[in-house]
């Protein structure tokens, strides 16, 4: 049940609109009634939604094709204070090889294969709980990173994303999640298992 709450909450966080890249951190935007509080930190956007949730905040990076203006890759990372765990949602375009999953790669880290959970008309999604070691590896990497997807024809495609501001955005998101989270009480619920490298 904890896994369903975790996945449901992260999926809900991804319903907000896309963002563009920015160069400098910005003060939180004043939130209109029912709208998320937004704070730009380099290439990441920290969002907190005005909902009673075990994880009302996430950090997001969405990259669009400049020519077609279609989303190429979106990454959302949320933190669940009551579980001391993270959840990740990665959205990629359709026409990928579902069985091959995807990987996240940096200069010092390569994730295990992450399996897709679902697809809709907007793309395919990896949605899962991850261990803190994956987040720490992303935070300690220098330079850029990429999501590596595979097509049905066997070709792989690296979709680049930025780690600029990752650590600062992560720390800000975790602090806000701890301050705003409304724990869900569950008797003896174990945290979802994270993939092993």
Where are these regions (language model features)?
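Bacterial N-terminal signal peptides that target proteins for export
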Residues: 1-9
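Bacterial N-terminal signal peptides
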Residues: 8-17
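A generic "folded-domain core" signal
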Residues: 22-197
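Intrinsic low-complexity/disordered segments
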Residues: 1, 18-20
